[in-house]
C-alpha cells in the first residue's frame, strides 16, 4: 500500500490480526521469534534471528512500511555504514507498501549512506516497497522468481474545510510527481511511461519488473557473493571471540 499523507486504500491481503506488536524493532513480529544460540570460548550467546542477520549486514523489511519500520531500518542502515562504509548491505523486501513519508525516509537514507545496498524481493514489493527495491545499487537489484512487484500512484484521504482539502490534494499531487521522478531516475523509463503505469495498480512479474528497470536480475538461488559475505562475517566473528 502506498498511502498518502493520511491514509490509503487497502490491498487484497491485509496484515494478519494474529501478528503481535513489534518488539524493539520496526519489523512486524509474530508471536514466536526464532532464537540463534552461538557457542564460543566465552560461552553461549543468544540472538533473535533478525539481530543475527544484522550481523551478516542483512536487513529485512516484512509487512507494511510505517513509522515503526522506518525508524528501525534507518537506524540499521546508519549503523552498518558506520561499521564498514565500503561493504555491501543486503535488504530483503516482502512488503505491500505503506506510508509514503516513512518509505521516503528509508529511501533517502539508502541514498545518503556510502555503503552499496543490494535489494532482494521475495513474496511482494508493492507500492512504496517497489521504490525501495528499485533504489538498490545498479546491478544489485534482484527478485526471486515467484515474487510480485506492483507500482501505483499514492492515495490519501482528508476531511475538513474546503480550503484545507484543496491544500492536501495539492500536496498529494506534489508527492505523486516526486515519486514519478524517482522511478524515472532508477528505472530509466521516460516520465510519460512511468506516469501512465503509475496511474492505476500495475502488477508485474519479476521478468516484467526487470524489463521495466525496477530490478536487474531474477534469481532462484543465493548469489555467490552474498554467501561469501556471510561466511566472511562468520569467520571474523569467530576469530574475535
From Swiss-Prot:
Its EC number is 3.4.21.92. InterPro entries: ClpP, ClpP/crotonase-like_dom_sf, ClpP/TepA, ClpP_His_AS, ClpP_Ser_AS. The active site is at 127 (nucleophile), 152. It is found in: Mitochondrion. It catalyses: Hydrolysis of proteins to small peptides in the presence of ATP and magnesium. alpha-casein is the usual test substrate. In the absence of ATP, only oligopeptides shorter than five residues are hydrolyzed (such as succinyl-Leu-Tyr-|-NHMec, and Leu-Tyr-Leu-|-Tyr-Trp, in which cleavage of the -Tyr-|-Leu- and -Tyr-|-Trp bonds also occurs). Keywords: Hydrolase, Mitochondrion, Protease, Serine protease, Transit peptide. Constitutively expressed in leaves, shoots, roots and flowers. One of its GO terms (molecular function) is serine-type endopeptidase activity. Gene3D superfamilies: 2-enoyl-CoA Hydratase, Chain A, domain 1 (3.90.226.10). It is an enzyme of class 3 (hydrolase). One of its GO terms (biological process) is proteolysis. Homotetradecamer. Component of the mitochondrial ATP-dependent Clp protease. Cleaves peptides in various proteins in a process that requires ATP hydrolysis. Has a chymotrypsin-like activity. Plays a major role in the degradation of misfolded proteins. Belongs to the peptidase S14 family. This is ATP-dependent Clp protease proteolytic subunit 2, mitochondrial. The gene is CLPP2.
